[in-house]
């Protein structure tokens, strides 16, 4: 008896929550909850006339809602984790997101269509989304930080700003002597002799950017 009532109460809760809005259904749901508490004791109900009328009206409303409700099937994949057979959250954009992903730290927007989810913003059970989750959607202990560009000059001219912006290196490769003239000359010497160690980042060959060729124009006087 109690299991059937719990299932019925949950269904009524979800239907009323989506039909009346996420902030206006509390009073209506409270009426059904009062009747549920009395039915859970297994005794014959003793209701006032106003409670009976209110309950009948809500039952009729729920029946109308059920007729206009689309049945959600759990065979569809979650658009975040691609898992099936999980209970999905009802979203205004009609995309499928499982509850595990829905309550994790993420933006209040659909990852597929970028539609806003105002109800998630007001949900106290949803984890907030902050700067820590900006680069990594679900956060975690390890946060990725962008590596700094390689600065300095090499033989043959300065590195162009565009090339500097494109060169990225790991933090473990950086050292105080990486861009020193002696270190660069040593790497050039190893490169010419083909005796550098591929497993040692400091011995990797130095790549010289091509020199910029200036266009030569000839002025012909007539």
Curated annotation (Swiss-Prot):
GO molecular function, one term: zinc ion binding
Keywords: Metal-binding, Zinc, Zinc-finger
Zinc finger intervals, RING-type: 78-114
Name assigned to this protein: Putative RING finger protein ORF118
Native species: Ostreid herpesvirus 1 (isolate France) (OsHV-1)
InterPro entries documented for this protein: Znf_RING, Znf_RING/FYVE/PHD, Znf_RING_CS
Biased composition (Low complexity): 189-198
SUPFAM superfamilies: RING/U-box
Region ranges (Disordered): 184-222
């Amino acid at each position: 008896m109690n299991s059937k009532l719990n299932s019925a109460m949950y269904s009524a809760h979800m239907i009323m929550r989506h039909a009346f809005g996420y902030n206006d259904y509390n009073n209506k749901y409270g009426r059904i909850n009062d009747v549920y508490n009395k039915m859970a004791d297994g005794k014959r109900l003793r209701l006032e006339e106003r409670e009976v009328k209110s309950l009948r009206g809500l039952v009729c409303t729920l029946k109308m809602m059920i007729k206009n409700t689309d049945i959600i099937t759990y065979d569809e994949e979650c658009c975040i984790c691609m898992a099936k057979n999980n209970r999905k959250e009802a979203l205004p954009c009609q995309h499928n997101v499982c509850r595990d992903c829905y309550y994790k730290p993420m933006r209040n927007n659909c990852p597929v269509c970028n539609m806003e989810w105002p109800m998630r913003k007001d949900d106290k059970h949803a984890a907030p989304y902050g700067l820590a989750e900006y680069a990594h959607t679900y956060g975690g202990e390890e946060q990725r930080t962008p590596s700094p560009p390689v600065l300095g000059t090499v033989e043959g001219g300065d590195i162009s700003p565009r090339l500097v912006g494109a060169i990225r290196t790991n933090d473990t490769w950086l050292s105080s002597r990486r861009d020193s003239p002696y270190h660069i000359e040593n790497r050039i010497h190893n490169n010419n002799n083909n005796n550098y160690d591929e497993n040692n980042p400091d011995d990797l060959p130095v790549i010289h950017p091509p020199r910029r060729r200036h266009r030569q124009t000839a002025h012909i006087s007539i």
